[in-house]
Amino acid sequence: MKVLVLLLVTLAVVYAAPDPRGILINLEDGEICMNSAQCKSSCCQHFSPLGVARCTRKASENSECSPKTLYGIYYKCPCERGLTCESDRTIIGAITNTNYGICLDAGRSKE
């Protein structure tokens, strides 16, 4: 019973005044991450298979992109809001995280 009370008090103290920056979530660009859900930008990217993943801003128009990831970490970030990642999507590419494309403005590309 004492352990439960101590645990509840500890949790109350931890959540009483959360840091807006965050330690595990709400990470800024450049901070080390393990999953895109931790980043404010929603993109956790690593530049090599052995490299450390860091939060990075999403891809801008005409930049390389990944449409989706199964693992939460990207080699190429998805597009900014309002853009679409035009790519050849394959099952193998989805598994190996190599379905790369280019960010295009959906409104302009249909004209």
Swiss-Prot record:
Signal peptide residues are 1-16
Keyword tags: Digestion, Disulfide bond, Lipid degradation, Lipid metabolism, Secreted, Signal
Q: What molecular function terms (GO) are annotated for this protein?
A: enzyme activator activity; lipase binding
Question: Which residues are assigned to the propeptide feature?
Answer: 17-21
One cellular component (GO) term of this entry: extracellular region
UniProt keyword Cell division, yes or no:
no
Xref: Pfam families: Colipase (PF01114), Colipase_C (PF02740)
Disulphide bridges: 33-44, 39-55, 43-77, 65-85, 79-103
Tissue expression summary: Expressed by the pancreas.
Q: Where in the cell is it found?
A: Secreted
Show the InterPro entries listed in the entry. Answer: CLPS_chr (IPR047576), Colipase (IPR001981), Colipase_C (IPR017914), Colipase_CS (IPR017915), Colipase_N (IPR017913)
* Family, as annotated: Belongs to the colipase family.
Q: How does it assemble?
A: Forms a 1:1 stoichiometric complex with pancreatic lipase.
Q: What does this protein do?
A: Colipase is a cofactor of pancreatic lipase. It allows the lipase to anchor itself to the lipid-water interface. Without colipase the enzyme is washed off by bile salts, which have an inhibitory effect on the lipase.
> What name goes with this protein?
Colipase
Species source reads Ictidomys tridecemlineatus (Thirteen-lined ground squirrel)
